[in-house]
Amino acid sequence: EFHFNRYLTRRRRIEIAHTLCLSERQVKIWFQNRRMKWKKDHKLPNTRCDLPTLPRPLPARLGKHKL
């Protein structure tokens, strides 16, 4: 079903839920998760998520404290 249409009508969601003995909510969430996975798998290879970068630690001062 997902290969033909990534979004379901309520009527189709009810039909699938009844056929698979699942709740409508379970079917809805499965389709939501599958859409997210599809988006993730079909990203362009050159695009990447820019994660916030952490500040680099300051370099330790050599020779500041002698033993």
Curated annotation (Swiss-Prot):
One GO biological process term: embryonic skeletal system morphogenesis
Presence of keyword Iron: no
Keyword check for Signal: no
UniProt KW keywords: Developmental protein, DNA-binding, Homeobox, Nucleus, Transcription, Transcription regulation
Entry-linked SMART domains: HOX
GO molecular function: DNA-binding transcription factor activity, RNA polymerase II-specific; sequence-specific double-stranded DNA binding
Location of this chain's protein in the cell: Nucleus
CDD domains, per the entry: homeodomain (cd00086)
DNA-binding interval(s): 1-42
GO cellular component, one term: nucleus
InterPro entries: Antp_homeobox_Deformed_sf (IPR050609), HD (IPR001356), HD_metazoa (IPR020479), Homeobox_CS (IPR017970), Homeodomain-like_sf (IPR009057)
The organism's place on the tree of life at top rank: Eukaryota
Function: Sequence-specific transcription factor which is part of a developmental regulatory system that provides cells with specific positional identities on the anterior-posterior axis.
Family of the protein in this entry: Belongs to the Antp homeobox family. Deformed subfamily.
Protein name: Homeobox protein Hox-A4
Protein's organism: Rattus norvegicus
Encoding gene per record: Hoxa4
